[in-house]
Amino acid sequence: GFIGSALIRYLLSDKENIIINVDKISYASNKNSINTEDNKRYTLIEEDINKPNLISETLESYKPNYIIHLAAESHVDRSIDNPDSFIFSNIVGTFNMLQGCYKYWNSLESKELERFKFLYVSTDEVYGSIKNKNLSFTEDSNLKPNSPYAASKASGDLLVRSWGKTYNFPIITTNSS
Protein backbone atom coordinates (compact mmCIF):
# COMPACT_ATOMS: atom_id res chain seq x y z
CA GLY A 1 0.00 0.00 0.00
CA PHE A 2 0.88 3.68 0.00
CA ILE A 3 2.26 3.90 3.56
CA GLY A 4 4.06 0.56 3.41
CA SER A 5 5.83 1.31 0.13
CA ALA A 6 6.93 4.74 1.39
CA LEU A 7 8.22 3.12 4.60
CA ILE A 8 10.14 0.46 2.68
CA ARG A 9 11.79 3.09 0.46
CA TYR A 10 12.79 5.03 3.58
CA LEU A 11 14.13 1.96 5.40
CA LEU A 12 16.14 0.90 2.35
CA SER A 13 17.86 4.31 2.33
CA ASP A 14 19.76 3.08 5.41
CA LYS A 15 22.31 0.59 4.09
CA GLU A 16 22.09 -1.50 7.27
CA ASN A 17 18.42 -2.46 6.91
CA ILE A 18 17.26 -5.75 5.43
CA ILE A 19 13.55 -5.74 4.57
CA ILE A 20 11.28 -8.78 4.35
CA ASN A 21 7.89 -7.71 3.01
CA VAL A 22 4.92 -10.07 3.25
CA ASP A 23 2.18 -8.71 0.98
CA LYS A 24 -0.72 -10.47 -0.71
CA ILE A 25 -0.61 -7.81 -3.47
CA SER A 26 -4.23 -6.69 -3.58
CA TYR A 27 -6.07 -3.69 -5.04
CA ALA A 28 -4.12 -1.31 -2.76
CA SER A 29 -0.68 -2.71 -3.67
CA ASN A 30 1.68 -1.67 -6.42
CA LYS A 31 4.92 -3.63 -6.70
CA ASN A 32 6.32 -0.94 -9.00
CA SER A 33 6.13 1.72 -6.27
CA ILE A 34 9.29 0.26 -4.71
CA ASN A 35 12.39 0.20 -6.91
CA THR A 36 13.91 -2.99 -5.53
CA GLU A 37 14.78 -4.97 -8.65
CA ASP A 38 18.49 -5.34 -7.88
CA ASN A 39 18.35 -4.71 -4.15
CA LYS A 40 19.61 -7.78 -2.31
CA ARG A 41 18.44 -6.26 1.01
CA TYR A 42 14.77 -6.52 -0.01
CA THR A 43 12.66 -9.68 -0.23
CA LEU A 44 8.99 -9.73 -1.23
CA ILE A 45 6.92 -12.71 -0.12
CA GLU A 46 3.64 -12.61 -2.05
CA GLU A 47 1.35 -14.27 0.48
CA ASP A 48 -1.56 -13.50 2.78
CA ILE A 49 -0.76 -13.18 6.51
CA ASN A 50 -3.70 -15.52 7.11
CA LYS A 51 -1.93 -18.42 5.37
CA PRO A 52 -1.33 -21.13 8.00
CA ASN A 53 2.24 -21.20 9.36
CA LEU A 54 3.41 -18.40 7.04
CA ILE A 55 4.35 -15.99 9.82
CA SER A 56 6.17 -18.57 11.95
CA GLU A 57 8.07 -19.99 8.97
CA THR A 58 9.04 -16.53 7.70
CA LEU A 59 10.26 -15.41 11.13
CA GLU A 60 12.30 -18.57 11.63
CA SER A 61 13.86 -18.20 8.17
CA TYR A 62 14.80 -14.52 8.37
CA LYS A 63 15.13 -13.88 12.14
CA PRO A 64 14.09 -10.20 12.21
CA ASN A 65 14.68 -7.75 15.05
CA TYR A 66 11.56 -5.72 14.33
CA ILE A 67 8.11 -6.34 12.92
CA ILE A 68 6.13 -3.52 11.35
CA HIS A 69 2.56 -4.73 10.81
CA LEU A 70 0.83 -2.64 8.14
CA ALA A 71 -1.16 -5.43 6.47
CA ALA A 72 -4.79 -4.33 6.24
CA GLU A 73 -7.84 -3.81 4.14
CA SER A 74 -8.00 -0.05 4.28
CA HIS A 75 -10.78 1.72 2.40
CA VAL A 76 -13.80 2.88 4.43
CA ASP A 77 -16.19 2.73 1.46
CA ARG A 78 -15.14 -0.82 0.56
CA SER A 79 -15.70 -1.88 4.19
CA ILE A 80 -19.34 -0.85 3.97
CA ASP A 81 -19.93 -3.06 0.92
CA ASN A 82 -17.72 -5.98 1.99
CA PRO A 83 -17.06 -5.98 5.76
CA ASP A 84 -16.12 -9.68 5.93
CA SER A 85 -12.80 -9.17 4.12
CA PHE A 86 -11.96 -6.38 6.59
CA ILE A 87 -12.78 -8.60 9.57
CA PHE A 88 -10.68 -11.44 8.19
CA SER A 89 -7.67 -9.32 7.22
CA ASN A 90 -7.63 -6.71 9.97
CA ILE A 91 -8.73 -8.79 12.95
CA VAL A 92 -7.88 -12.42 12.16
CA GLY A 93 -4.73 -11.34 10.28
CA THR A 94 -3.57 -9.27 13.24
CA PHE A 95 -4.25 -12.21 15.55
CA ASN A 96 -2.14 -14.45 13.28
CA MET A 97 0.67 -11.88 13.27
CA LEU A 98 0.57 -11.65 17.06
CA GLN A 99 0.56 -15.42 17.55
CA GLY A 100 3.45 -16.02 15.15
CA CYS A 101 5.50 -13.09 16.42
CA TYR A 102 4.89 -13.94 20.07
CA LYS A 103 6.02 -17.54 19.50
CA TYR A 104 9.13 -16.27 17.68
CA TRP A 105 9.85 -13.68 20.41
CA ASN A 106 9.71 -16.40 23.07
CA SER A 107 12.34 -18.39 21.18
CA LEU A 108 14.88 -15.53 21.17
CA GLU A 109 17.93 -15.34 23.39
CA SER A 110 18.11 -12.48 25.90
CA LYS A 111 20.02 -9.97 23.72
CA GLU A 112 17.65 -10.41 20.76
CA LEU A 113 14.66 -10.59 23.11
CA GLU A 114 15.41 -7.11 24.46
CA ARG A 115 15.88 -5.62 20.98
CA PHE A 116 12.72 -7.09 19.42
CA LYS A 117 9.71 -4.77 18.85
CA PHE A 118 6.29 -5.25 17.24
CA LEU A 119 4.94 -2.05 15.66
CA TYR A 120 1.25 -2.09 14.75
CA VAL A 121 0.19 0.64 12.33
CA SER A 122 -3.43 1.55 12.93
CA THR A 123 -5.55 4.56 11.96
CA ASP A 124 -7.05 7.64 13.56
CA GLU A 125 -10.40 6.35 12.25
CA VAL A 126 -10.63 4.21 15.41
CA TYR A 127 -11.36 7.41 17.40
CA GLY A 128 -14.35 8.43 15.27
CA SER A 129 -15.15 11.90 14.02
CA ILE A 130 -13.79 14.97 15.71
CA LYS A 131 -16.26 17.84 15.85
CA ASN A 132 -13.96 20.55 17.22
CA LYS A 133 -10.99 21.05 14.88
CA ASN A 134 -8.96 22.48 17.80
CA LEU A 135 -9.04 19.11 19.56
CA SER A 136 -6.99 16.06 18.72
CA PHE A 137 -6.79 12.39 19.62
CA THR A 138 -4.32 10.76 21.99
CA GLU A 139 -3.65 7.12 22.71
CA ASP A 140 -5.91 7.52 25.74
CA SER A 141 -8.90 8.72 23.70
CA ASN A 142 -11.97 6.47 23.66
CA LEU A 143 -12.42 4.20 20.67
CA LYS A 144 -15.48 5.27 18.65
CA PRO A 145 -15.24 3.61 15.23
CA ASN A 146 -17.85 4.71 12.68
CA SER A 147 -17.35 2.13 9.91
CA PRO A 148 -16.57 -1.57 9.58
CA TYR A 149 -13.02 -0.56 8.58
CA ALA A 150 -12.54 1.54 11.72
CA ALA A 151 -14.11 -1.16 13.91
CA SER A 152 -11.79 -3.82 12.45
CA LYS A 153 -8.73 -1.64 13.09
CA ALA A 154 -9.95 -0.80 16.63
CA SER A 155 -10.27 -4.55 17.23
CA GLY A 156 -6.69 -4.95 16.05
CA ASP A 157 -5.61 -2.14 18.41
CA LEU A 158 -7.21 -3.98 21.32
CA LEU A 159 -5.67 -7.33 20.38
CA VAL A 160 -2.21 -5.77 20.15
CA ARG A 161 -2.69 -3.94 23.46
CA SER A 162 -3.82 -7.16 25.14
CA TRP A 163 -0.69 -9.05 23.97
CA GLY A 164 1.41 -6.25 25.44
CA LYS A 165 -0.40 -6.27 28.79
CA THR A 166 -1.04 -10.02 29.12
CA TYR A 167 2.25 -11.41 27.79
CA ASN A 168 4.59 -8.41 28.20
CA PHE A 169 5.04 -8.60 24.44
CA PRO A 170 6.98 -5.50 23.28
CA ILE A 171 4.34 -3.64 21.27
CA ILE A 172 4.06 -0.14 19.85
CA THR A 173 0.88 1.13 18.20
CA THR A 174 0.63 4.20 16.02
CA ASN A 175 -2.65 5.69 14.81
CA SER A 176 -1.85 7.59 11.63
CA SER A 177 -4.28 9.44 9.40
What is each stretch, according to the model?
Residues 1-177:
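N-terminal Rossmann-like NAD(P)+-binding domain of SDR-like oxidoreductases, especially those catalyzing
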